[in-house]
Amino acid sequence: MNKVVLISGGAKGIGKAIALELGKQGYDIVINYLTSELEAHALKDDIIKNYGVRCLTIQADVSREDEVDEMFSLIESELGGVDILINNAAIDLSNLFHLKNADEFRKTLDVNVVGAFNCSKKVYRHMLDQEYGRIINISSTNGINTYYPMCIDYDASKAALISLTHNLAFEFAPYIHVNCIAPGFIGTENELDGYDEEFLKEEVEKIMVNRYGDPKEVAYLVKFLVSDEADFINNTVIRIDGGQKGSC
């Protein structure tokens, strides 16, 4: 039977690329989304048509424990337990510090960190019982260095996700491997549509390979980390940023 992969925030961007790549490799896929319903269902249809694996789409706010409980109940009834968890769901409410309020700060942490906590807690028992599990947390180079102003809540959440990775790896060893990927500037829909051409040009100049990353390149790294070939990789943060230069 195929291993089951849950990707939070899996309908667009990096999450979509991961869903497509792992579906191509023969994994059964669960696409979690919150608002991107059309994109999620279109992605599901593509995966089933092209790769012949089982695929579910489930709307759930991963920051809410009750909705995560319902999501996992549905997964277990349809596919069984989750063998591989990709904590990818994230929001970015960028603003200057003096214009930001505590509710915005809290919301970012709730989705980006508490969401990963909630999903990791739900997969733990199944993974432990079968003596196998893989958890990949999608952080950011912003969780390691500060590259931009106005990102205090996002950066703090991504740094917390790195810390969560290390703590879970210690507690979940030896059977459950927990690793973290820290992408730099990746050419997702949000990134390319959200900035003007001049800003994108300036960002590329800060990258040693002189281009921004493709979501597929993050997906290729995920594919490796969940494979048997990566069995000796655990409790690790891997940057995928083309050699990002400088920080604030």
Regions found by a protein language model. Give the residues of each.
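Conserved glycine-rich cofactor-binding loop
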Residues: A11-K12
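Alpha-helical segment proximal to the catalytic Tyr-Lys
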Residues: R125, H166-P174, D231
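A conserved structural motif in NAD(P)-dependent oxidoreductases
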Residues: I207-V218, E229
